[in-house]
Amino acid sequence: MELSKGRLTTTPKTHLGDGIFSIIHLFDTVQISSEGLRWKYDSCKGHQVVKSGSTKEGTSVLMNVSTSSHNTLQNVFNKYSTDINNSLFDRAEVPVSLARFDSENLMSRSQARRLFRNLEKFHEVCIDFKGIKLIGDSFADEIFRVFQNQHPDLKIECINANVHIENLVSGVRNNGNNYS
């Protein structure tokens, strides 16, 4: 899940963590397999998935780009950057589906905290609810009241949310003091 956010680094004093993120988005498909997990990004279909993968020792990376691809570095910069402070990669798009294990529902505060770990580094976060039918009150409250209050300058937007999720998010945003 952290790969999909960007700004992933083990040495923040010397490295921004944007390199692998920008490279991934230049390719049409990317697949990384390691320690029994496989993460796949498909820019054409606009989705990412995590599945069980090979348990072979080591890490494998497969990257494909079509000769007719329209991915450019400028397009990647434009999509994941705001005009605030002329920063590059200060906007994250996070597929909510990556926070789930198997087909579990997203109900708890701990699931929301896992999804939003390290997102305070950005100016803008777009949460993609594609494929998510239901979230719990606590999950929504942790993101749209607790996290938002801790980071008031961070803009959080939602896409691909169904009516249930839109109503729940709206309720938390408008009546946050009534939720706990």
Predicted segments with their positions:
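Flexible ATP-lid and adjacent glycine-rich G1/G2 motifs of the Bergerat
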Residues: M1-G53
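Two-component histidine kinase transmitter core
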Residues: G36, S66-H70
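Regulatory and interdomain segments flanking nucleotide-handling catalytic cores
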Residues: K45, S66, N75-F77, N162
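Amphipathic alpha-helical interaction surfaces in cytosolic regulatory modules
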Residues: A99-N177
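Short, cationic low-complexity segments
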Residues: N75-L98
